[in-house]
């Protein structure tokens, strides 16, 4: 699983651009989806997403973000679903207390701010193919209540 320290290295003070072609790397269809908000597992997965697409990815620096610092219900639910799927295939938990199901563990990791995933929000796709995104760590975001 992703180490907590690895997630903090994703952003620089400068905007970073990555350009690769589809043939160079392949990632799962979950990261290739065209949703506005995407869940990425680590900085390397984020780079893999860009390498698998034909677009240039521009990451907005932390201090210039324009979207809300609150997770939407969709984002929170997707984080829980992706994390529960990881746990169901023998992923290690970030919690000390025992829970009965992967969904319960994933929810508690989210609410305890220990979930090892990141949220990538697409801000804009320019006509020349640049995809402008913000990458958020759920630990620094407000979390909605999930039933």
Curated annotation (Swiss-Prot):
Keywords: DNA-directed RNA polymerase, Host cytoplasm, Transcription, Viral transcription, Virion. InterPro entries: DNA-dir_RNA_polK_14-18kDa_CS, Pol_omega/Rpo6/RPB6, RPB6/omega-like_sf, Rpo6/Rpb6. Gene3D superfamilies: 3.90.940.10. Its main location: host cell. One of its GO terms (biological process) is transcription by RNA polymerase I. One of its GO terms (cellular component) is host cell cytoplasm. Pfam families: RNA_pol_Rpb6. It is found in: Host cytoplasm; Virion. GO terms for molecular function: DNA binding; DNA-directed RNA polymerase activity. Part of the viral DNA-directed RNA polymerase that consists of 8 polII-like subunits (RPB1, RPB2, RPB3, RPB5, RPB6, RPB7, RPB9, RPB10), a capping enzyme and a termination factor. Component of the DNA-directed RNA polymerase (RNAP) that catalyzes the transcription in the cytoplasm of viral DNA into RNA using the four ribonucleoside triphosphates as substrates. Belongs to the archaeal RpoK/eukaryotic RPB6 RNA polymerase subunit family. This is DNA-directed RNA polymerase subunit 6 homolog. It comes from African swine fever virus (isolate Warthog/Namibia/Wart80/1980). The lineage of its organism: Viruses, Varidnaviria, Bamfordvirae, Nucleocytoviricota, Pokkesviricetes.
